[in-house]
Amino acid sequence: MTAVPVSQIRNFSIIAHIDHGKSTLADRLLQVTGTVSDRNMTAQYLDNMDLERERGITIKLQAARMEYVADDGEKYILNLIDTPGHVDFTYEVSRSLAACEGALLVVDASQGVEAQTLANVYLAIENNLEIIPVLNKIDLPGAEPERVLDEIEEIIGLERTGAIRASAKEGIGIHDILEAIVHRIPPPADTVAEPLQALIFDSYYDAYRGVIVYFRVMSGSVKKGNKIRFMASGKEFEIDEIGVLKPFQVPVDELHAGEVGYIAAAIKLVQDARVGDTITLVSNPAATPLPGYQEAMPVVFCGLYPTDSDQFEDLREALDKLSLNDAALHFEPESSGALGFGFRCGFLGLLHMEVVQERLEREYDLDLVTTAPSVVYRVNKTDGTVLEVQNPADLPPSQLRTSIEEPYVKVELITPQEFVGTLMELSQGRRGIFKDMRYLTPTRTTLIYEIPLAEVITDFFDQMKSRSRGYASMEYQLIGFREGNLVRLDIVLNGEPVDSLSCITHADKAPEVGRQLTAKLKELIPRQQFQVPIQAAIGSKVVARENIAPLRKNVLAKCYGGDISRKKKLLEKQKKGKKRMKSIGSVDVPQEAFMAVLKLEG
């Protein structure tokens, strides 16, 4: 392959809210430019994980290099860097946008601008990208292009004259989009002569070649056989293979500034090649890494336990393999009295957690029990140290701590006017602090709240969708820790605390949560031969209690009439037996009880 002049390269990504047609548009571009032959084309070509196709979401990033001969007769190289559209993966989106000079903003002509569209547009503006608005799905009977163009102009502030009307499904407007990419998106800066700086925007694990790193060369050039260094981790490797992505890999000898490609260098751990890190040459290193690198921090935690304890090692192996591909997944072994051995796992958000659980069950054939999702709490202890608590069972007793801080998020809800009241009620019910309310158009409103993350990670999203009949959309970002009046609620069964059912909750809500939990457990725990009290306690103070009535045999059945003292003797004997049984009996909590409690909390 011949070296391409930098002026002929265009790097762009596609940003859109879920279901606005991003993957279909990518398919059309690949097809029209002849990158993927019609014979090999499958719907959503770039979403190559089954789960991605099923849920219709893009989880892992992909990249594709297309060759396009424009109307002016020049041949251009277009690099499409695909972005995940979901809020959990914001960091990945920001890195892939940093690897581009322009972006196609895809907006559904019937839905209009949604919360995540906006969030990603702000990221694109921060990275100084040229944004080309594309009105997708104009062939739908419900399309209202004029209204949506007004929204694009009013909410985002892009000129409506520059918007392209298209239908990715029908192939309308694709040529105009390609021309706009060539003529409106600027070429990369010509920095071939400078030391190598390349931005990693994705990496994945290949069983034969180790970690494959996807990157964009920002300055300098890189060849096969070069020794490279990852600047954040400090690790050094020699390049075995370097190439471009058409989405399949094609080896080349050299890549220079502005190009996008992949490297294989016998890297063992994804953690060594993290998204956002800078690659440079050992022989002629860059003075500074590229800005914007962050370690992926898990936000939501939950316990994963195999239903069959023999599968513990299989689960460890599966998590090891998944973490090869997912640097944001953290896990460490933990054991619980009720569930046996398992792992405490950290995720970027709820979707990330669901995706990981589903992949474990589907790809590794495991049966899992998951504990309720929780967040990290910061505990300020009396001796001045700060402890980070992920598992409610690890919370130090109240006399050893001065305060507990919990993470807060800024939640932005975009909703049609008529649902504002019910969504405000939902946010305030979740201890939300009202910050701002803006009218985007006469019929659409943005609500901005600050809400504790613990209240958002359960079923906030589902509630928001059902209260707004699916029309509202949300976006959240972490804004830091704040002190709160938090307590640990323990469930005590027959005098024994059950560690896996503990949860940290706000003091005002604790009695209510306790009542719901005990009532639910009463339905689910099978009756024993003796009475079983279920209590919800904060420290030593019981806030809710239910009793499970005992099963009893009718010991008087064989007494016909007869003396009352005879009956009394038999009843006393039964009572003593029950008492003895209660002191030595243990209550097993069935798995359904755990699941139900999660549903209640979740």
From Swiss-Prot:
It catalyses: GTP + H2O = GDP + phosphate + H(+). Gene3D superfamilies: 3.30.70.240, Elongation factor 4, C-terminal domain, Elongation Factor G (Translational Gtpase), domain 3, P-loop containing nucleotide triphosphate hydrolases, Translation factors. Residues 7-189 form the tr-type G domain. Its main location: membrane. It holds the Pfam family EFG_C. SUPFAM superfamilies: EF-G C-terminal domain-like (SSF54980), P-loop containing nucleoside triphosphate hydrolases (SSF52540), Translation proteins (SSF50447). The keyword Metal-binding does not apply. Keywords: Cell inner membrane, Cell membrane, GTP-binding, Hydrolase, Membrane, Nucleotide-binding, Protein biosynthesis. It is found in: Cell inner membrane. It is a peripheral membrane protein. CDD domains: EF4_II, EF4_III, LepA, lepA_C. One of its GO terms (cellular component) is plasma membrane. GO terms for molecular function: GTP binding; GTPase activity; ribosome binding. Required for accurate and efficient protein synthesis under certain stress conditions. May act as a fidelity factor of the translation reaction, by catalyzing a one-codon backward translocation of tRNAs on improperly translocated ribosomes. Back-translocation proceeds from a post-translocation (POST) complex to a pre-translocation (PRE) complex, thus giving elongation factor G a second chance to translocate the tRNAs correctly. Binds to ribosomes in a GTP-dependent manner. Belongs to the TRAFAC class translation factor GTPase superfamily. Classic translation factor GTPase family. LepA subfamily. This is Elongation factor 4. It comes from Gloeobacter violaceus (strain ATCC 29082 / PCC 7421).
